[in-house]
Amino acid sequence: MFRYESLEDCPLDEDEDAFQGLGEEDEEIDQFNDDTFGSGAVDDDWQEAHERLAELEEKLPVAADEQTGNGERDEMDLLGDHEENLAERLSKMVIENELEDPAIMRAVQTRPVLQPQPGSLNSSIWDGSEVLRRIRGPLLAQEMPTVSVLEYALPQRPLQGPEDDRDLSERALPRRSTSPIIGSPPVRAVPIGTPPKQMAVPSFNQQILCPKPVHVRPPMPPRYPAPYGERISPNQLCSVPNSSLLGHPFPPNVPPVLSPLQRAQLLGGAQLQPGRMSPSQFARVPGFVGSPLAAMNPKLLQGRVGQMLPPAPSFRAFFSAPPPATPPPQQHPPGPGPHLQNLRPQAPMFRADTTHLHPQHRRLLHQRQLQSRNQHRNLNGTGDRGGHQSSHQDHLRKDPYANLMLQREKDWVSKIQMMQLQSTDPYLDDFYYQNYFEKLEKLSAAEEIQGDGPKKERTKLITPQVAKLEHAYQPVQFEGSLGKLTVSSVNNPRKMIDAVVTSRSEDDETKEKQVRDKRRKTLVIIEKTYSLLLDVEDYERRYLLSLEEERPALMDERKHKICSMYDNLRGKLPGQERPSDDHFVQIMCIRKGKRMVARILPFLSTEQAADILMATARNLPFLIKKDAQDEVLPCLLSPFSLLLYHLPSVTVTSLLQQLMNLPQSASAPAPSNSHLTAVLQNKFGLSLLLILLSRGEDLQSSDPAIESTQNNQWTEVMFMATRELLRIPQAALAKPISIPTNLVSLFSRYVDRQKLNLLETKLQLVQGIR
């Protein structure tokens, strides 16, 4: 290795990044020189020796008509001397057939020839065609059967001048000091970088492929990996553990052991790109340093020499075997030669040093490389390629995740999706979809009536009707699991575990358990009755959608469920003449039960609804007490008012007696007023009482054929109600929800004017009358 005085003497290309990196690598190169040749290798003034050698090479005459050979040469002549001309060496690497190609010769002739500068080393080697000398193939084939490609490319030894007859030992540098690592160099030392004078061919090849290990200091790896196209230094190249540029990849985590000759060879081979090798890369091969080609313009060499050199795909191929001989020009088909066909843009290639990758990753890279090659071939190919190109593009557009499922698996997924559309009751399972299309049908019907435009046909999803087997669900029960159900549901709520244990007597626990069980049974009855109510409310829609022959069965089923609801409310047991009010009162004590009764009343018959109203009137004070917090009883006023208009006069009178807690017969003793007082102090009770009085008065005035007994009962009830309204204070009287309009005429028949004004003031009827 030489340290050049200026960047112009450097044999690298005119790359600014390489020039900047050269100065940074000087210190590292000095360290490698010390480790290789000893600490005294650079003590002497070797720069003066290098300049002296450079002046000797400048004095060498470049003879254009020099003879190509002087007879037989021995093996040392084939390897070449140390002062042979690099320009002639490169000229002998040019293939004979390519020079005879007329296309290349025309390209060479059309380019302007640069005039060489006198006294400089930058003169072009293309100044004369006689410089391009042919390689003596037969001579090399006979005398050098085992010569490698690098030795094959070396030209013949030129004639020695008068100064070249001297041995190189006369120009040798002074003796160097002993190196602590590899000892001192031989006595006949030569400048650093000078090729060996004598070396046998087998040993030379063996040193290239399997060099002797020399322990050197491993350099620091680069912080960022360099791109594929950029040049890297030999130190960085040697730091690659599994590079494909080496003959034998090093194992991981082991620093490579290379000889100085291999470092110089890797410097030239690592820069090779697939398909092309520029002349500047030839200039970095050991033995070419310091030659006239080092100072030539690299762009000129890339334009002229790069087209004629055979492609060198990788560094290993450059040292393995010579390229195949090109057929003679007369065998070429008409058209551009193969060297011009190679000028087409090539598809991007993947770097070859992928031995460290996973086998699956390497296979993916290979597949991508094949796809890029096929795509490039289809785009740049000639002839009829329309069908093939379209099929290839379709193949590229193909979804990589396609055909991952078998047809059996696809059918299985389709069946699962179709099962969601199979329903015995689409209106219940897909309520919003059905209502949405009902609205659309109504809008379309309105548009047809108006006749604004043509009828629009809307596509509607047809849900298949499938017979669904109904089975009774029975939760799993385990004996001894705290004595409770293992599955919690609405019908079977799970008991919470008592965290606090209090000491109670057996009687208290028994009573509490009875109350708890009774309430739990009531909740279960409410849930079952609510389920029946929802089914009954849905029968109207089912009746409209059903066929004519199916409607009688639906009506019978509806009546049966209505009777079941009434039995659940009244709690009538088999064989019992009159149901007990206790069961109904327990339902009415729960807020959900009161709302449910208000929804059930319109579906019941008149007799059934009247029975519910009678039970409510008899137990109204107790229900008012339980409803003090919820205040849900007013929701029953509207269905009760509608029911009163369908009841006869006898039933209305009986209801009023039950509400006022009056005896059914005149012989019975007069009851206490606590019951009626509680009714008057509640807005629901007072409103219900006024509605009953108004409806009874209408029935009494409209039907003159009423018996005297019924008339007497009605008159007695009216006097009792009027007397109680006058007795109760106005502050204690509740404000009614609604007031009938015929109350003034009703009270005027039973009281005088003074009492009538007092009643009007209490009930705030003045605004309603006037």
Curated annotation (Swiss-Prot):
One of its GO terms (biological process) is negative regulation of translation. It is found in: Cytoplasm, P-body; Nucleus; Nucleus, PML body; Nucleus speckle. Residues 389-448 are annotated as: Region H. Residues 85-388 are annotated as: Region N. Residues 1-397 are annotated as: Involved in nuclear foci localization. GO terms for molecular function: G-quadruplex RNA binding; poly(G) binding; poly(U) RNA binding; RNA binding; translation repressor activity. Residues 1-84 are annotated as: Region A. The keyword Cytoplasm applies. Keywords: Cytoplasm, Methylation, Nucleus, Phosphoprotein, RNA-binding. Residues 321-337 have a biased composition (Pro residues). The modification Omega-N-methylarginine is found at R385. Residues 223-397 are annotated as: Involved in RNA-binding. The region C, also named Pat-C, is required for RNA-binding and mediates the binding with the Lsm-containing SMN-Sm protein complex and the decapping machinery. It folds into an alpha-alpha superhelix, exposing conserved and basic residues on one side of the domain. Belongs to the PAT1 family. This is Protein PAT1 homolog 1.
